[in-house]
Swiss-Prot record:
Gene Ontology CC terms, in alphabetical order: cytosol
Name the UniProt record assigns to this protein: DNA mismatch repair protein MutS
Keywords: ATP-binding, DNA damage, DNA repair, DNA-binding, Nucleotide-binding
PANTHER family: DNA MISMATCH REPAIR PROTEIN MSH1, MITOCHONDRIAL, DNA MISMATCH REPAIR PROTEIN MUTS FAMILY MEMBER
GO biological process, one term: mismatch repair
Species of provenance: Enterobacter sp. (strain 638)
HAMAP family per record: MutS (MF_00096)
Family, as annotated: Belongs to the DNA mismatch repair MutS family.
Pfam families hit by this protein: MutS_I (PF01624), MutS_II (PF05188), MutS_III (PF05192), MutS_IV (PF05190), MutS_V (PF00488)
Length: 853
């Protein structure tokens, strides 16, 4: 904006605006003017497009018309929500000076910066989703990543070793805003993400980061947090903390610790796996028919958010898992009485964050009081539950009787939205406030008496006393009787059918009332701030209580789901393997109108890979996904949709299921498929669960078959992972004859004429046929095309019965075989240009080639 270069050419107000705007050049500036927030120049044009509001002009400054857009201050939250959802940040500039005493423009300053990752206002947040601010750092040794939920104070860092792990972490956390260094090399990793913020290199400096974090936590070093030896993670965390301080412009007492997330503590799932399993988001980008949608009947928003974190970070520590299982078992006959009480607790976690940031509104304090009022009942109900983990949660929950009594005394039953509206502090809490209020409230009686007195004295039946915000108190007389107004009645306003007057007595009373109202409101604001000061020392205990209540909500919810949906408690075993009796897909069984066909599964060190064949739509993908989802549920401590489950250690879950062209990156379906396959072959171990669906279908038949065979061979013989390998290549059903630990299973169907019935039952052995033409007919492919396809199928089968199978041998199909050597004569011929040879040279070449052969 060139306007900043010549400030003196502008009006004093525009000079003030331009100076403030220069401090925030890359974000929108909401500049408070009276009852509106105004935007000027390029900001006005952008806001007009983003918010669909009118673009106007405000006079001229420096001889040029000023583009302007404005929004009413009382509707600012709605507009902020729209901007934040589009990844925009906004600096809020307020009037802090008194217009009555200001000689030039009223003093203004930016009081807060609203960004997608640092919002805490409930109007701007998704209630049942975490809203994270993250920072990413990269050097030659790997990545550093830090994520903060400012609405709870939860602060985490990690050090992903490679690009795939970093991509998985970004998808798991899905930050609303992502900070990155100006020299960040892997832009392809983050391009297209919302809320990207480029930051200067010095903000990622390690010594500054340590200093910032120690200052925040009041510590001398970071050893106690277990992050001292995570330099890359600390670089990211330091930048993130600096950014939060810059935007919030206040202390952050609710951010009291930082935790290191280590890969070995949880089951690792890459980005493709999270997407394919539809954990919290379906493949279309929505939330319907996901695992979370089925599993989440939590009664508090903070419980819902915790459940989703559990689903994305399954735990490998069986002690934690068994403890959760026992708690769920203990709560199974209690959820009907506990859930209605817990529902009343609400979102205590986010209320506490707003308290810490000193942005809590009166209704937040009322909700906090209501949450405290539930604790005695909840603690009494939990006292009867015979479970050590439950009793620990009950203890952590606390009771906060004194704080509850304070809020009951101090805050009215149903407070207004904002403290500036007045009427927040309860009568009887503060003597001086009551006196000022009595004076202000006494106005009604006085005005009634004045109106009766003047009406009777003057004999004017249309006379009445009123008040409006612009003209203050007045006496109104109809136009027809206005000529009877006494001489000391001073005309204040003329209306179409009436005249309004002021008298010295009324003016004197108005000053008195307005003074008392102003004094009452100022005192009320002071008392409101003092309430924050009284609550703040208890913040750590309150946050621990909110966390315990959220965990209790998750566990009670899992108990209710287990009971309602007929889930069983899985057993953890030491040896690798998964044994499932009557397993079901948790989502599909809820969507189907007919009963879901349950199926068994047996994977063990002696039976590591299942080759799954059967028709399209026969249920292969459902069977594979349900296995992964049952494993995932077991490793968050939940009961699972099966009659019985025994499950061994799992370190990673991989899925290579379905793919689409990645047009943005210029990658074909086959390239996407091969990239995911390469990731599995490089990173899977004998404790990994691998789902491979239709590998190799994106290329020619023999290429695809060769790749599928080699991948299956590597997974079964070299990696020894627990693998479900679905395929249409019937040649792969020979693998069990050639390799140990591989078995065939199939999903069957019955064909009758042109119709097909899918049995959805898993049986041992290979499928007898594909039923592809029957499925095509079912999909509505024209009959003449199906008829022609049957003819062609018979021709191909008669020409080449199982031709491919005769060419595939496990001992020869490994992709790792060295290429055949090329003969010297062939190499010489390939490099020869016959058109450039003379007859003599050609003759010499013939002799040379003869010698090479």
């Amino acid at each position: 904006m060139s306007t900043i270069e010549n400030l003196t050419a502008h009006t004093p107000m525009m000079q003030q605006y331009l100076k403030l705007k220069a401090q925030h050049p890359e974000i929108l500036l909401f500049y408070r003017m009276g009852d509106f927030y105004e935007l000027f120049y390029d900001d006005a044009k952008r806001a007009s497009q983003l918010l669909d509001i009118s673009l106007t002009k405000r006079g001229a400054s420096a001889g040029e018309p000023i583009p302007m857009a404005g929004i009413p201050h009382h509707a600012v939250e709605n507009y902020l929500a729209k901007l934040v959802n589009q990844g925009e940040s906004v600096a809020i500039c307020e009037q802090i000076g008194d217009p009555a005493t200001s000689k030039g423009p009223v003093e203004r300053k930016v009081v807060r910066i609203v960004t997608p990752g640092t919002i805490s206002d409930e109007a701007l947040l998704q209630e049942r989703q975490d809203n994270l601010l993250a920072a990413i750092w990269q050097d030659s040794k790997g990545y550093g990543y830090a994520a903060l939920d400012i609405s709870s104070g939860r602060f985490r860092l990690s050090e992903p070793a490679d690009r795939e792990t970093m991509a998985a972490e970004l998808q798991r956390t899905n930050p609303a805003e992502l900070l990155y260094a100006e020299d960040f090399a892997e832009m392809a990793l983050i391009d297209g993400r919302r809320g990207l913020r480029r930051r200067p290199l010095w903000e990622f400096e390690i010594d500054t980061a340590r200093q910032q974090l120690n200052l925040q936590f009041g510590t001398r070093d970071l050893i106690g947090f277990g992050v001292e030896n995570a330099p890359r993670g600390l670089c990211a965390a330091g930048c993130l903390l600096q950014y939060v301080k810059d935007t919030q412009r206040t202390t952050l007492p609710h951010i009291r610790s930082i935790t290191m997330e280590r890969q070995q503590d949880s089951i690792i799932m890459d980005a493709a796996t999270r997407r394919n399993l539809e954990i919290t988001q379906n493949l279309a980008g929505g939330v319907e028919n996901t695992l979370a949608a089925v599993l989440d009947s939590t009664v508090t928003p903070m419980g819902s958010r915790m459940l989703k974190r559990w689903l994305h970070m399954p735990v490998r520590d069986t002690n934690v898992l068994v403890s959760r299982q026992q708690t769920i078992g203990a709560l199974q006959d209690r959820f009907t009485e506990l859930q209605p009480v817990l529902r009343q607790v609400g979102d205590l976690e986010r209320i506490l964050a707003r308290l810490a940031l000193r942005t809590a509104r009166p209704r937040d304090l009322a909700r906090m009081r209501h949450a405290f009022q539930q604790l005695p009942t909840l603690r009494a109900q939990l006292a009867e539950v015979n479970s050590t983990p439950v009793q620990k949660l009950r203890e952590t929950m606390g009771e906060f009787t004194e704080l509850c009594e304070l809020l009951e005394r101090a805050v009215v039953e149903a407070p207004p939205v904002l403290v500036r509206d007045g009427g927040v502090i309860a009568p009887g809490y503060h003597e001086e406030l009551d006196e000022w209020r009595a004076l202000a409230d006494g106005a009604t009686d006085y005005l009634d008496k004045l109106e009766i007195r003047e009406r009777e004295r003057l004999g004017l039946d249309t006379l009445k006393v009123g008040y409006n915000a612009i003209h203050g108190y007045y006496i109104q007389i109809s136009r027809g009787q206005s000529h009877h107004a006494p001489i000391h009645y001073v005309r204040r306003q003329t209306l179409k059918n009436a005249e309004r007057y002021i008298i010295p007595e009324l003016k004197e009373y108005e000053d008195k009332v307005l003074t008392s109202k102003g004094k009452a409101l100022a005192l009320e604001k002071q008392l409101y701030e003092e309430l924050f000061d009284m609550l703040m020392p208890h913040l750590a205990d309150l946050q621990a209580s909110a966390s315990a209540l959220a965990e209790l909500d998750v566990l009670i919810n899992l108990a209710e789901r287990a009971d309602t949906l007929n889930y069983a408690c899985p057993t953890f075993i030491d040896k690798p393997g998964i044994r499932i009796t009557e397993g079901r897909h948790p989502v599909v069984e809820q969507v189907l109108r007919e009963p879901f066909i349950a199926n068994p599964l047996n994977l063990s060190p002696q039976r590591r890979m299942l080759i799954i064949t059967g028709p399209n739509m026969g249920g292969k993908s459902t069977y594979m996904r349900q296995t992964a989802l049952i494993a995932l549920l077991a490793y968050i401590g939940s009961y699972v949709p099966a009659q019985k489950v025994e499950i061994g250690p799992i370190d990673r879950i991989f899925t290579r299921v379905g793919a689409a062209d990645d047009l943005a990156s210029g990658r074909s379906t086959f390239m996407v498929e091969m990239t995911e396959t390469a990731n599995i072959l490089h990173n899977a171990t004998e404790n990994s669960l691998v789902l491979m669906d239709e590998i190799g279908r994106g290329t020619s038949t023999y290429d695809g078959l060769s790749l599928a065979w080699a991948c299956a061979e590597s997974l079964a013989n070299k990696i020894k992972a627990l693998t479900l390998f679905a395929t249409h290549y019937f040649e792969l059903t020979q693998l069990p004859e050639k390799m140990e630990g591989v078995a065939n299973v199939h999903l069957d169907a019955l064909e009758h004429g042109d119709t097909i019935a899918f049995m959805h039952t898993v049986q041992d052995g290979a499928a007898s046929k594909s039923y592809g033409l029957a499925v095509a007919a079912l999909a509505g492919v024209p009959k003449e095309v199906i008829k022609r396809a049957r003819q062609k199928l018979r021709e191909l089968e008669s020409l080449s019965p199982n031709a491919a199978a005769t060419q595939v041998d496990g001992s020869q199909m490994s992709l790792l075989m060295p290429a055949e050597e090329t003969s010297p004569a062939m190499e010489a011929l390939e490099n020869l240009d016959p058109d450039s040879l003379t007859p003599r040279q050609a003759l010499e070449w013939i002799y040379r080639l003869k010698n090479l052969v």
